[in-house]
Amino acid sequence: MLKCFEPSVLGRELDREPFKFSHQLLGHPALDLDNLAKVIPALPSEYVKYSKGLMRNGDDFENCDVQHRSQMSLAETIESMRTSDSYVMVRSPQIHESFQSVFRDLSGDVEQLLRKTLGHRQRLLINPRLYLFIASPGSHTPFNIDRNSTMLLQFRGSKQLVLFPQWEPRVVAHEAREAYAAFDGTKLPWSEARESFGQRFDFAPGEGLHIPFIAGHYVQNHEDDVSISMSIIFNTPESQAQLEALQLNHKLRGMGMAPAPVGQRAGRDQLKSFLWRARRKVRHTLRLPPDN
């Protein structure tokens, strides 16, 4: 029995296409703005990024806290969120006790979805964790991609998310996707020509959206209210293999090779994943420093 998602989500297959769904977590005390104003400043600083100033597509989203540094404290930023053109992102809020139960329930629901399509295999749900987002009315999250699969849930305010095909090289070139997967080059090129590939989703409190692994997207918050949303991100055995294959491709390109793109043949991606993990194991055995 699902605790967080409406039962209709059980008929959908993750990472094949985006889909909207309804969630049952509205009113959860952890997501109340007053609770967030207490919890977030108490978290270790490395778990929280916040910035000021409207961002746009083409900005380096992963480094927005450096490029758009706020002069306000974190507490002041949260208190003035309605008027300050600010953005707060919290990594792994489940380390705080007020988020631990909702994290367990969301993880359990996602695992049920995976079992529905993949059967009762071990390690279906790989490295799940929460991300929390608070944004001023009208704020914009630049075009970016995730190294994970995502279930994004809206709790306050409304927004539009524009989502792009996972493997379309005219949106993100193979080389750029591989570098991003390897944490080597997180500023993605952007041009208006890419817009024609986008699929638009409007959603409000109580609604959610599945963002497939590595699918590019950007977000425009509406002007009606402060936006509060939370996602559970994770990998599956398939997406983990694809991630490792992307990282291997990036390494091979650095050696002057032209590897076949990821996402076209599952068997080839699995082989690349095996080779990448074997390489890491050898480097660890030889006590060589980790690299991308």
Range-by-range predicted roles:
Residues R200-D202, T236-N292:
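Conserved double-stranded beta-helix
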